[in-house]
Amino acid sequence: MFTSPYRSKNFDSLQAAAQQFPRLFAPRSERSHKGTYGTLAVVGGAEGMSGAVILAATAAMYGGCGKVWAGFNQAELPFAVIAARPEIMLATAAQLQARSDVSAWVCGCGLGLGESSLRVLQNQLTLAHERA
């Protein structure tokens, strides 16, 4: 249930989505596995902002994505941050951008404003153009 300060504006967004997109909420086959439901890459997480990528990746898992990668714009991966979410796979942003098996991308969650963040974004936009 999502709410607003105005009681008349509250709505159950999942129920609304189920009505608008019934295929997304159909029961999954017993013979399926996480690879059946696509691979999402969430790129961002500059130093000190790892939580943004983890939150987005966690939301993707709850939303039904199959495999979810979290790509961090940091020299060292924040393994401690991800300890509670072992189902989310880790990589640096550069490692993740080199993968060819990603079905969809999310870029910018906690990416920051530094030069390395700009390079990550430029690389991501180039990849999107090349793979379109």
Role assignments for model-derived ranges:
Residues 1-132:
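Small-residue (G/A/S/T)-rich helix-start motifs and N-terminal tracts that mark the onset
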